[in-house]
Curated annotation (Swiss-Prot):
Keywords: Glycoprotein, Membrane, Transferase, Transmembrane, Transmembrane helix. It holds the Pfam family UbiA. Its main location: membrane. Belongs to the UbiA prenyltransferase family. The chain crosses the membrane at residues 22-42, 60-80, 101-121, 127-147, 155-175, 186-206, 233-253, 260-280, 296-316. Its cofactor is Mg(2+). Pathway: Secondary metabolite biosynthesis; terpenoid biosynthesis. This is Polyprenyl transferase pyr6. It is an enzyme of class 2 (transferase). It catalyses: 4-hydroxy-6-(pyridin-3-yl)-2H-pyran-2-one + (2E,6E)-farnesyl diphosphate = 4-hydroxy-3-[(2E,6E)-farnesyl]-6-(pyridin-3-yl)-2H-pyran-2-one + diphosphate.
Amino acid sequence: MATAQSPTQLVRTLIDVSRFDKYNCLFAIFPGVWSIFLAAASRHADGVHLPSDWVLGRAGLAFAYTYLLSGAGMVWNDWIDRDIDAQVARTKNRPLASGRLATRAAIIWMLVQYAASVWLMDRMLSGQNLWTFMLPLTTGIILYPFGKRPTTRKLGIYPQYILGASSALTILPAWASVYGDSVAPPDLLAKCLPLCVFLFLWTIYFNTAYSYQDVKDDCRLSVNSSYVLAGQYVHGLLLLQAVAVVMVIPWILHENGSAWLWFSWLGVWTAALAEQLYLFDTKDPSTGGRVHRRNFALGIWNVLACFVELLLVSGSLDMF
């Protein structure tokens, strides 16, 4: 039975269940915003001028729709996992697990966020091919919590794989919003593929570290997670994942990457991931959370790096 709350308390609870009071949802905005800036830079390099206010408007729409879609996904995840969350130290006080929020209110809130996200993506795409992109994203959100079940482990599927694929899929509508009908779908996919692979691998890496915080409770409750794959060699698994992330960056940059992106992306990320691997300690699961926060900082850094790349390619830095 949900606890009776004042309107102010209910608003705070709804913010809490969507993680809008934390940085987690902001991970979802990185692929779309990076992609808007990189796609706009690519078009400028091809001689197509895009007004700066138009590009920033598209980036704002990408930010807003992914943020709200992530919030809706958080509610769905917590509703499916509410009985498990109630038995895990880190998650037992979440609104649905603790009984602070009724299921009906949570579902309504989730649908409101989802509807707003659909509308914003439609605006970003100028009404073109909305459900071509939204349906795969929605499918990923629905499947994600079920990836934590022991049954999916038998199939070799881990929740990080689903989360990584969902994250990578937000790249496609962002590039499509910038290129419109000027590029055929197969060519657009070819342009996006390196960045999609990068997002898939990076998400698996930082979420493996993040989920390791719950290793004791997860083992007790048989919760499926990618670190289960490695047993006691979790550090080695994170090393392999980090190396894979770094190795994909030259694939992204080899065609159009400037000296700035080679430094700000490949150089900074290589150093940052090395520092994270040094920081992570299998004997102290809380270090997984610290690694996660450092990856959030990397995501913010890359937003700035991609924006500077756009300014460099478009010649906008000449005014400074």
